[in-house]
Regions:
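Surface-exposed loop and adjacent secondary-structure segments within mature catalytic domains
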Residues: 1-185
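A structural signal for short secondary-structure junctions
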Residues: 127, 195-196
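Membrane-embedded translocation segments of transport machinery
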Residues: 170-173, 189-193, 211-212
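Long hydrophobic segments that form regular secondary structure
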Residues: 179-194, 200
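Short acidic, glycine-rich surface-loop motifs adjacent to enzyme active sites
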Residues: 197-212
Length: 212
């Protein structure tokens, strides 16, 4: 079954993904990949014993390139026809492709016509022709603010008939966010890259809310 981006591409539209998560995370992956299980995001995670949640009986062995499948999520991102993909997850692209230990997934993306960018300033000079793959952090993009003294958000608790609220805490600027693109900056760059009379489909995800 074709996904929405494949249908848009077939209709002549430009296609793009912008996310503050890894570009291999579940939401962006659903627009770019066909896979049995969301955690089969790299070639070495395709078999049940290597999957992040081994208690699940699901395996993606049948999706491996070596078995005639389309490959892991990251391999499918690298071989996709997307015009622009911006987010995090650069570490996923350092692994080698299934069946070819001499080629990394990042190199595979370049072979497929992607220009890989990594820095905020690169958004101001996107190539006019090549596909663009922006990988601005090793995993999910850092959030803009963090709790003072390492404070983390806590769940609301319930004791009997009473709701127990966690203690509020102050936030401060997150130094890890320095040099990172905002969701707005990535979205603006993607629209600028895709804008044409043919039209485009762009999926934009503010993913950080469920990563903290």
């Amino acid at each position: 079954v074709a996904n929405l981006m494949e249908l848009a591409d077939a209709a002549g539209f430009g296609t793009g993904i912008v996310t503050t998560s890894s570009v291999t995370d579940a939401s962006p992956a659903s627009f770019m990949a066909h896979i049995e299980y969301r955690y089969c995001d790299t070639p070495d995670a395709m078999e049940r014993e290597n999957i992040r949640m081994p208690q699940d009986s699901t395996s993606c062995g049948q999706d491996r390139v070596a078995n005639g499948g389309l490959g892991s999520v990251v391999e499918q991102v690298a071989t996709s026809k997307m015009d622009i993909v911006l987010g995090g997850g650069s570490d996923k692209f350092t692994v080698t492709v299934d069946g070819d230990p001499s080629t990394t997934v990042r190199e595979q993306a370049k072979f497929n016509g992607y220009t890989v960018i990594q820095h905020l300033a690169d958004l101001d000079r996107l190539p006019a022709e090549n596909r663009v793959l922006g990988l601005f952090s090793s995993g999910h993009l850092p959030v803009r603010s963090r709790g003072v003294n390492g404070a983390k958000a806590e769940y609301i608790d319930r004791v009997g008939d009473k709701v127990v609220w966690p203690e509020p805490f102050a936030c401060e600027a997150n130094p890890e966010f320095i040099g990172m693109p905002t969701l707005a900056a990535m979205t603006k760059a993607a629209i600028g890259r895709l804008n044409s009379d043919a039209g485009f489909m762009l999926m934009v995800e503010a993913a950080s809310i469920d990563k903290e």
